[in-house]
Amino acid sequence: MFISISAGIVTFLLTLVGIPAFIQFYRKAQITGQQMHEDVKQHQAKAGTPTMGGLIFLIAAVVVSFLVALFSKQLTNNVGMILFILVLYGLVGFLDDFLKVFRKINEGLNPKQKLALQLLGGVIFYLFYERGGDMLSIFGYQVHLGIFYIVFALFWLVGFSNAVNLTDGIDGLASISVVISLSAYGVIAYVQGQMDILLVILAMIGGLLGFFVFNHKPAKVFMGDVGSLALGGMLAAISMALHQEWTLLIIGIVYVFETTSVMMQVSYFKLTGGKRIFRMTPVHHHFELGGLSGKGNPWSEWKVDFFFWGVGLLASLLTLAILYLR
């Protein structure tokens, strides 16, 4: 446990030092920062803010986790595959960000390219991950999926990778939401005695807390797709490694809600010929524009943040209660 906590502290400090250096490099190189294409007026002031900051906490967490796991003899298959997902999905996000920032391609990777790379990572994860069978745990009941587990694994990894990406829309929202989710999985890993997984979890929590120092409103840096896609994939991989896949639907309720709001909005818009359910999606923008109802006073980013963090915290506590207070 001490080793895992130490890994988190080291990652926190590395990120705390690395982000200012990254921002300084960004400015000196006169790199065009984040482009704003949203209809939220208060976001226009963020144009030009350095992005791709997720690269710093991602490298710090992966390197520290690998080295500490190696020297403490905890470099298990679980650790290897979680780090693999972090690296591969991080690379997908990096390529997407690179095209947007350096090649001035607003779309970055097109949806088909991004999906293909994410699916490739998922297939490799499934082929090399020794999870001890193709059983899916649902509220304590084991369901044998056989070959269909790969379909679930791909859906889980790609779905939550993109869900966290959608959540990363206002200052600090995604970083602390993921800290809350990872903390819940840290408890589960500890109770199960899986200290190898706990090591990776605490290392990433340290990195995210260090990043948040510069990402809270007003953000000095954004994580970019390199950070958000990797974090979503990590959460999905951890839920599978712990054989508690179903828990991510509750622990990750914020990401589920964000994604569902987009799907509902698009479907309703097409069915009704232009009508909307929400003012704007992902749904955190709806609250920004008009509160819970969408017709009231606009919420500040801090208010939206605390609302979603509160929902995520309650959902995580509920999940732990379901698991351990039965």
UniProtKB/Swiss-Prot annotation:
EC number per UniProt: 2.7.8.13
Ribosomal protein listed as a keyword: no
Family matches, as InterPro entries: Glycosyl_transferase_4, PNAcMuramoyl-5peptid_Trfase, PNAcMuramoyl-5peptid_Trfase_CS
Domain of life: Bacteria
Subcellular location as annotated: Cell membrane
Name of the molecule in the record: Phospho-N-acetylmuramoyl-pentapeptide-transferase
Encoding gene per record: mraY
GO (cellular component) term, any one: plasma membrane
Keywords: Cell cycle, Cell division, Cell membrane, Cell shape, Cell wall biogenesis/degradation, Magnesium, Membrane, Metal-binding, Peptidoglycan synthesis, Transferase, Transmembrane, Transmembrane helix
Primary role: Catalyzes the initial step of the lipid cycle reactions in the biosynthesis of the cell wall peptidoglycan: transfers peptidoglycan precursor phospho-MurNAc-pentapeptide from UDP-MurNAc-pentapeptide onto the lipid carrier undecaprenyl phosphate, yielding undecaprenyl-pyrophosphoryl-MurNAc-pentapeptide, known as lipid I.
Annotated transmembrane regions: 3-23, 51-71, 79-99, 115-135, 138-158, 169-189, 195-215, 221-243, 304-324
Family: Belongs to the glycosyltransferase 4 family. MraY subfamily.
The species this protein was found in: Streptococcus pneumoniae (strain Hungary19A-6)
Catalytic activity: UDP-N-acetyl-alpha-D-muramoyl-L-alanyl-gamma-D-glutamyl-L-lysyl-D-alanyl-D-alanine + di-trans,octa-cis-undecaprenyl phosphate = Mur2Ac(oyl-L-Ala-gamma-D-Glu-L-Lys-D-Ala-D-Ala)-di-trans,octa-cis-undecaprenyl diphosphate + UMP
Membrane-topology descriptor: Multi-pass membrane protein
GO BP terms: cell division; cell wall organization; peptidoglycan biosynthetic process; regulation of cell shape
